[in-house]
Amino acid sequence: LLSKGVAESLARGVEVLEQAGAKVLAGGKPSTAAGFRHTNTLLRATAKQFIAAPHVLQTECFGNASLAVVCEDVAELLCVLKSLEGNLTGCVYSDTAGSDDATYDKIVPALRERVGRLLNDKMPTGVAVSAAMNHGGPFPATGHPGFTAVGIPTAIDRFAMWACYDNVRETRLPDALKNKNPTGKLWRSIDGEWTQK
C-alpha cells in the first residue's frame, strides 16, 4: 500500500464492514510482512444487508479488499444499484451470445448514472491515457465529477481554477484576457468565436 496511513485506513474500513455484518471470506487482517501491507481480502454481504445499511457497507476500503453483495434476483440487484454512492467504475459481465441482454438492459441504466466509467466483460484495472478515457465519477468517487484523473486533455482541468471576470476594467484583467492577445498565438474564445487576435 502507499503508506502507513493508507494501510491503517484499509484495516479500519474492513473492520467497519465486518461490524456491519459483512462476512470475511478471505484475508481480513493486516499482513505480518514488512512494509505497508494487508492480506488480500474478500467480504460477502447479502443484498438485504446492503439495502438496510448502504452507507456503512460502502465504507471506502482503498486497497486490496472487495465486498461481494449477493442478490437473489434482478429486482434486488436494482435496489442495490439505486443505493450506490458515486463510483469510479462499474463492471457488468454478460453472455457474449446475448442470452442475458434483457437483464443487461435493466442493469446498465441504473448503474450508468452512478459511475464514471462503465465496463462490459472487463476488469477496471487498466486505464488507458486517451481522450476518450474517464477516471472520475459522481461524488464521492471524485471531488469534482466533471473532471478525470486521466485522459487528454481533460485531466489537466482538475488542476484548473475556474474564474469569471465580470465588468472588470481592461487594465485589471490578466494579460490573456485583455482585448489585445499578449502573444498573438494564444487561442481565445471571444463572443463565441475562436481567434488568435
Language model features with spans:
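Generic signal for short, ordered secondary-structure residues
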Residues: 56, 137-138, 182
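Short, structured secondary-structure boundary patches
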Residues: 44-50, 141-144, 189-192
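Extended hydrophobic packing segments that form well-structured cores
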Residues: 173-197
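C-terminal core of ALDH-fold dehydrogenases
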Residues: 33-36, 74-173, 194-196
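Generic structural signal of hydrophobic/aromatic residues within well-ordered alpha-helices
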Residues: 13, 53, 107, 159, ...
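NAD(P)-dependent aldehyde/semialdehyde dehydrogenase
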Residues: 1-92, 102
